[in-house]
Amino acid sequence: MCDAQDWFTESYPDNGSALSLKIRAKLHEEQTPFQRIEIYDTESFGKLMVIDGCTMVSDRDNFLYHEMMTHPVLYTHPAPKTVWIIGGGDCGSLREVLKHSEVEKAVQIDIDERVTRLAERYFPELCEANGDPRAELLFIDGIQWVKEAPDGCVDVIIVDSTDPVGPAEGLFNEAFFRQCHRCLRTDGILVQQSESPLFHLPLIASMHRIMRQAGFAQTRTLFFPQFIYPSGWWSATMAGKGDLNRFRADAAEAKLFPTRYYNADIHRAAFAVPEFFGDALRELV
């Protein structure tokens, strides 16, 4: 919400906290068939996209999220050629995926085309890869897309979704994970944004349990900073048909494209498990 002093504030009542950003102006607001989208110009974080009152993307720190949702999984898979991005309408994850020359096809499936069109207008740097011949943008229900896809047709699935409410709620259950498992090839990996380890620990633990129930052999969670998200600390959880410890470190160290956060050392560090998190997994998984 915006208050009289020109601050945008997102409150987290369940955790007794909030995030506020000083704004210069509201640039856009609309209600789509799926959600309410707002764009602000802020004093310190550049442009900010807000969906249903929740911060999604800012100019200043989006690189943290997009790099960590993509490069760790792509350097864990032995040979990622085909990638699906479920959600990801701001196109930042698509841009990072297509920095990998070995990727031959990347399909982004987002239910709300307006997110992408507004990103193209207000966050054009995130959409630089939209015209890449390897990219395909679909504006349909990602859950239905996965359900109708053939067996063993994709190497990596990235679920770059909003919080597990509204249009994204169906992306956090066993039925969806089973369909992803079916669609993945032998060494296939699913990675899904999994909220804050401080605020949403039971959700992450349940994701590990449900992913394994859906047939995945291994699960691992990686951690990274994300200032505009609840608690400022975020996570992504991988589920693999095979070994998730096969980090292609030589390839990561020799990467031919620039990143602002991700490198081989960050990759290793991101998977370090805090004691409280390990305890929760042992208790709840």
Curated annotation (Swiss-Prot):
An example molecular function term from Gene Ontology annotations: spermidine synthase activity
- What is the E.C. number? 2.5.1.16
A single GO BP: spermidine biosynthetic process
Q: Which reaction does it catalyse?
A: S-adenosyl 3-(methylsulfanyl)propylamine + putrescine = S-methyl-5'-thioadenosine + spermidine + H(+)
Per UniProt, spermidine binds at H66, D90, D160, S161, T162, D163
SUPFAM superfamilies referenced in this protein's UniProt entry, alphabetically: S-adenosyl-L-methionine-dependent methyltransferases
> Pathway it acts in?
Amine and polyamine biosynthesis; spermidine biosynthesis; spermidine from putrescine: step 1/1
Pfam families under this entry?
Spermine_synt_N, Spermine_synth
Q: Which InterPro entries match?
A: PABS, SAM-dependent_MTases_sf, Spermi_synthase, Spermidine_synt_N, Spermidine_synt_N_sf
Localization, UniProt: Cytoplasm
**Catalytic residues in the record:** D160 (proton acceptor)
Q: Which enzyme class, named as a word?
A: transferase
What does the UniProt record say this protein does? Catalyzes the irreversible transfer of a propylamine group from the amino donor S-adenosylmethioninamine (decarboxy-AdoMet) to putrescine (1,4-diaminobutane) to yield spermidine.
Quaternary form? Answer: Homodimer or homotetramer.
Q: What is this protein's record name?
A: Polyamine aminopropyltransferase
**Organism in which the protein naturally occurs:** Methylococcus capsulatus (strain ATCC 33009 / NCIMB 11132 / Bath)
